[in-house]
Amino acid sequence: MIGVTRRSGLALAVLVSSAACAGAEPVAPPPAPAPTAPSAVAVERFTPVERRPVADATTTAREVVVAGRTRAYRLHASPGAPALPEGRPLALVLHGKGGSAEEMERHSGLNAAADAAGVALAYLEGVAEGWSASPEPTDLRPDPDADVDFARAVVDELTGAARVDPDHVYAIGFSEGGMMALRLAAEHPDWFAGVASVAGQLPSPPAEVRPTGPIPVLSIYGDADPLRPFDGLSTAPADTPAIGKEPPKPTISTAETVEAFCRAGGADERRREEARPAAAPGGTSTSRETCANPDSGLRVVSITVHGGGHTWPGGTFPYRPAVVGATDRQLSTADTAVDFLLGG
């Protein structure tokens, strides 16, 4: 266990899962900063990572002290030495609002996907079942940067304790966890080699989060999400289901979120793939849009699940379809996220 003090100017944006309701008007996205040329280090981080499968990974409960507060996480990794000389890749995993690290590990399918690629996973535990996905303080989260500090502390600890390669650290989040992952990516693109967000969007004004540099981002979102609409959420309707211990945070649309990261990374080469047909009448289908910067290798990918709800495609989360909507069973979010982050 290590102690970590507050760093000056620390404000990390992470993709975190959050619950909200349909029927909101889209909010105009904040202006993105002018793209900057990626550094040589950044270009290296955007190149594919060699996959080295492991068969002996186990999960252990760990703690780290951050600004005097003990925070918990679950580390899933091989106890042996990393197969790669520079260390093992690491992905921070952020559960949704009202969820837990244990639930995320049990139902996401990420352990199997990560083991097949040799990636260590750190399932972080949120405070009061949620995250500071927005830089705006709340009664439950008076310090909006506490979760940013937590993420940094876990990476710092595991860089030594688990032989993690600091140049290949990622974040994966669902719902409010997806929002937290996006916040981390936006505010600290130099900390991560990529993030994957499922059912997450960037916060909207007045507590907006703006991407500040190039970083690979994967967004997976259902266009029939009944909790946090695909077109964003300005205010939650009165009949929003109670999820977690705080009201949902306002966000911009999925398209605006993705576009903000494209612009920040100078990724203006566009490609769209046609929708995968639904497996059955009334089922879900997917389409994919990619923006890329061919000079750096950076990609921002948006997968839309047509007919999909506020769900983790391919997962086994025990959520009622009447509340969260339909779950796509053909797409494996776990495999897709790990493959994207490692440069597949």
Curated annotation (Swiss-Prot):
Record-annotated disulphide pairs: none
Q: Does the keyword Signal apply?
A: yes
Keyword Signal assigned to the entry: answer is yes
One Gene Ontology MF term: hydrolase activity
Knockout-associated phenotype: Disruption mutant still produces nocardicin A at levels near that seen for wild-type strain.
Ranges of Basic and acidic residues composition bias in the record: 266-276
Top-rank taxon, per record: Bacteria
Region ranges (Disordered): 265-295
Q: What is its EC number?
A: 3.1.-.-
Please name the top-level EC class of this enzyme.
Answer: hydrolase
Pfam name, any one? Abhydrolase_2
The record's keywords, sorted A to Z, are:
Hydrolase, Signal
UniProt cross-references to InterPro entries, sorted A to Z: AB_hydrolase_fold (IPR029058), Plant_Biomass_Hydrol_Est (IPR050955), PLipase/COase/thioEstase (IPR003140), TAT_signal (IPR006311)
**Which residue positions does the secretion signal occupy?**
1-34
PTM note says: Predicted to be exported by the Tat system. The position of the signal peptide cleavage has not been experimentally proven.
SUPFAM superfamilies registered for this protein in UniProt: alpha/beta-Hydrolases
Write out the similarity annotation: Belongs to the AB hydrolase superfamily.
Q: What is this protein called?
A: Putative esterase NocK
